[in-house]
Structure formats: structure tokens, C-alpha cells
Amino acid sequence: MKKAVILFNLGGPDSLNAVRPFLFNLFYDRRIINLPNPFRFLLAKFISAKRENTARKIYEEIGGKSPILENTKMQANALELKLNENRNHVHKVFICMRYWRPFADEVIESVKQFDPDEVILLPLYPQYSTTTTLSSIENWQKNAKRYGLKCNTKMIHRYYDNQDFIEAHTNLIAKYYKLARKIGKPRVLFSAHSLPLSIIKKGDPYASQVERSVELIVEKLAINNLDWSICYQSKIGPVKWLEPSTESELLRAKADGVPVVLSPISFVSEHSETLVELDIEYKAIIKDGYYFRVPTLSTDPLFIKCLADLCINLP
């Protein structure tokens, strides 16, 4: 049997000229801004124009483009190798980005050429949110219908509590905790992408799933009297978002004089929100030598095993 696995991710601009259209695509998503047209269109135009210069400066810090596609390609290659250890099926992994290339329509054409017996949709978002997982799945389904991809399709919605996912995080955090312990008693900050409270109040389970991921990791770490906190980053605009912010928790740690081990709990690949926000902007808050940023899971063998098992064990 031939199986196509579609890895969903956010996407990112591949040049500075792509920054504004990328931002427009992001804010035009009705799962991000729930307004009817033409209001959503006009607001997306306004926000993308207003934020372009700020965003361009962020991408200039990391070579003028987002590394998310290259990082996702490494994950896709590792996953395809792992899946094809099972010789009963032939797996091919495709990457589909939500707000920049490769878009769903391009990917669907490639999938049609592969002609699979089954399609598996696998978002690179461990914790489910309507703004990420659901948005990607809905967009895929709409384009699959439009471009005539008729195939048995299965979906993976979440894996925030998967044993291998938890263990992969635990191992990385333990390594950096040990380094930080040489300075003092560390505080572990689990930083997740924030969401507006209005979305959470509508029943989005994202925050509760982030909390459960962290609970399981803390339990697995089994460190006596572990000092830890969940915090949220990447807030924009004046509305109320999930709190506390990562910045405020770093300022608290600075005031307390403790080393910080920061784990990007909701991110599985490196991009602007880790490489700039965490590694440059937030790092500057903490005293030199007191900041230990845990890398994203990327191609960690346990994480790749987690993804492969999710695909293989689908009913």
C-alpha cells in the first residue's frame, strides 16, 4: 500500500519581499481573525502593511528568510526513513505550509502524481488549536475538493501527551538543567506560543493541552522541588492573551537571581520565534551565563519515532 503523509507547518517568508504577503496570508485566515469579508480582507491588508517593517527586521537577524522550510524538510526526510523501515507499505512524506510556499494546491498536485492509496494529515503542532491544526486541515480539505484529490484520508489531531514526545522533551531539558545547576538552582520556563483569551473562551483546548504536556514532563523529570512555570510568547495587538508572558517570567527570574532553563514547549522546529525572540530578545533580559535555551525537538529520534508511530498506529 502507498501512503502519503502530509506534514503541516506554519510556513515562513523565503525572502524579505515575501514578508508582507506572508503576513497577509496569516491575518486573512478566518481562524486567526474571525470577521466576515470585506472586513477581514481590509484588516489583513492593514495589519500586514503596518507590521512589515518590524517583521523584516526580525528576518534580517536570521539571514533574510525563515529557516522553517529547511528545518521541516529535515524532519520530513527523517520521518520518511523511519516510516519506510516498515516494508509492508511505501510512505512518501510531503510538506504543506499554511501561509507560505509550498501551499496546499501545489502539494496536492504532487500527491496526485504519487497516487497513494491513503493520505495521512500530520500537523507539526503537538497541542491542538483551531488556529493551527484545524486551520491547516480545513485548508487542505477545501483544496483537495477543489483540485480533485479523492483518496482515503486520515487525520492526526494532537499528540501533546504522547510518551515519546514527552520523553524527548524530558531528555533535552534534563541535559540543560544539569548545565544550569552548576550556577545555582534553575527555574525551568516552558514557553508556548500565546493565543488571545477570546479564542480559549470559545473552547479551544490549546492551553489545557500545553499544561498537560508540561505536567507530564515535570513528572518525568522527577526533580525534587523543581522550580518551574508555564509562560506564553509572541503576543501582538491590544487584546488580552494567555498569561503570564515569557518576558514577565524572565524579568521575575532576573529579579530572583536564578538561572533559567527555557524550553519552547509548543514549537518543534527552529524559526523566528525561537531564533530571534528567544535567542536574541529574551536572552538579553537575563544575566550573561544564566540563560539556557533548550532546542526544539527538530529531528530528535524519539520525536521522529513519535510521529512515525502516530502514522503507523492509525486505525
From Swiss-Prot:
**A GO cellular component entry from the record:** cytoplasm
Q: What is the catalytic activity of this protein? A: heme b + 2 H(+) = protoporphyrin IX + Fe(2+)
Q: Does the keyword Ligase apply?
A: no
UniProt-listed GO biological process terms: heme biosynthetic process
Q: What class of enzyme is it?
A: lyase
**Main subcellular location of this protein, as a coarse class:** cytoplasm
Q: Where in the cell is it found?
A: Cytoplasm
Under the heading Gene3D superfamilies, the entry gives: 3.40.50.1400
Residues engaged in binding Fe cation? 193, 273
UniProt KW Metal-binding keyword:
yes
Its EC number is: 4.98.1.1
Tell me which Pfam families the record gives: Ferrochelatase
Q: Which family does it belong to?
A: Belongs to the ferrochelatase family.
- The entry's protein name is Ferrochelatase
Q: Which organism is it from?
A: Wolbachia sp. subsp. Drosophila simulans (strain wRi)
